[in-house]
Amino acid sequence: MRTGRIIKSLSGVYRVDSDGEMFDTKPRGLFRKKKFSPIVGDIVDFEIENVTEGYIQHVHERQNELKRPPVSNIDHLVIVMSAVEPDFSTQLVDRFLVIAHSYGLNPRIVVTKKDMASDSQIERIEKDLDVYRAIGYPVQFVGKNDNIETIFDEWGSGLAVLSGQSGVGKSTLLNAYRPDLAIETNQISKSLNRGKHTTRHVELFERKGGFVADTPGFSALDFDHIHKDEVKDYFLEIQEYGQGCKFRNCNHIKEPQCNVKAQVEAGNIAQFRYDHYVQLFEEIANRKERY
């Protein structure tokens, strides 16, 4: 019996990396009976059938898991945004951060295309990024002339998953780091100011200290698993200052003696962060139940 990590899944076949050796494996029938499917990122025990093939016998417990796209045991969720084409959006950053925290992931922010932005755009973006740095998020603002290897090394060991809307440069980052991958990239649609997703399945690629994955289908952010009363816990500074509110169940909207609103007034919580919190709270509060 050997142990390895699923790095790719295609048509019911799971490619497992076991100490640098690759095996194409299939799950035993017992998984079908349990209606359980292995996913990319899983740590598995498998029996070797021949030199390059085997059967998965056991899936280790997942430390965390994304539903869409399906990937598990993520150490870092890298939120990739671009300075321009498409334009940098703090609202989108905040929505990705909420998703990250809701799944128990460690998020970090990477902004690309610095070389394509004007001085005034860079100044505005840096001002916004300082807000995230002050909260405690690791932030990188990079252009095509930056050392890509250094950017990836800063992420530390383990599995780093790239997330972000289409066209922000996720595949370009990977290609610069690993030119041998030749991942397809797409030009930005001028009419929509965004790209089409070029990555069609989740695959883990080796990097120094671990793996990195690009993720398809990560532009339609899904908050169905989040209750409105949980949203405040996923805005870290709101969660912290919320402990000073008079009422324990304060949602920081219309409640009296709210410390969060007082800290927004005092400038200790960025207005845009509070506005995005309120928008998302109301969006989730007003959604219709799905049956």
UniProtKB/Swiss-Prot annotation:
Which protein are we looking at? Small ribosomal subunit biogenesis GTPase RsgA
User: Under which EC number(s) is this enzyme classified?
Assistant: 3.6.1.-
Needed co-factor(s): Zn(2+)
Q: Which family does it belong to?
A: Belongs to the TRAFAC class YlqF/YawG GTPase family. RsgA subfamily.
Q: Report if keyword Metal-binding is assigned.
A: yes
Q: Which GO terms describe its biological process?
A: ribosomal small subunit biogenesis
Biological role: One of several proteins that assist in the late maturation steps of the functional core of the 30S ribosomal subunit. Helps release RbfA from mature subunits. May play a role in the assembly of ribosomal proteins into the subunit. Circularly permuted GTPase that catalyzes slow GTP hydrolysis, GTPase activity is stimulated by the 30S ribosomal subunit.
Its gene name is: rsgA
Q: What class of enzyme is it?
A: hydrolase
The record's section on NCBIfam families has: ribosome small subunit-dependent GTPase A
Name the UniProt key words of this record, in alphabetical order.
Cytoplasm, GTP-binding, Hydrolase, Metal-binding, Nucleotide-binding, Ribosome biogenesis, RNA-binding, rRNA-binding, Zinc
Q: Which organism is it from?
A: Staphylococcus carnosus (strain TM300)
- Subunit and interaction comment: Monomer. Associates with 30S ribosomal subunit, binds 16S rRNA.
Please provide, alphabetically and separated by semicolons, the GO molecular function terms listed in this UniProt record: GTP binding; GTPase activity; metal ion binding; rRNA binding
Q: Which residues form the signal peptide?
A: none
Cite the CP-type G domain residue spans from the record: 63-221
PROSITE patterns xrefs: ENGC_GTPASE, G_CP
Q: Which residues bind GTP?
A: T112, K113, K114, D115, G164, Q165, S166, G167, V168, G169, K170, S171, T172
The set of disulfide-linked cysteines is none
Q: Name one Pfam family in it.
A: RsgA_N
Report the CDD domains cross-referenced here: S1_YloQ_GTPase, YjeQ_EngC
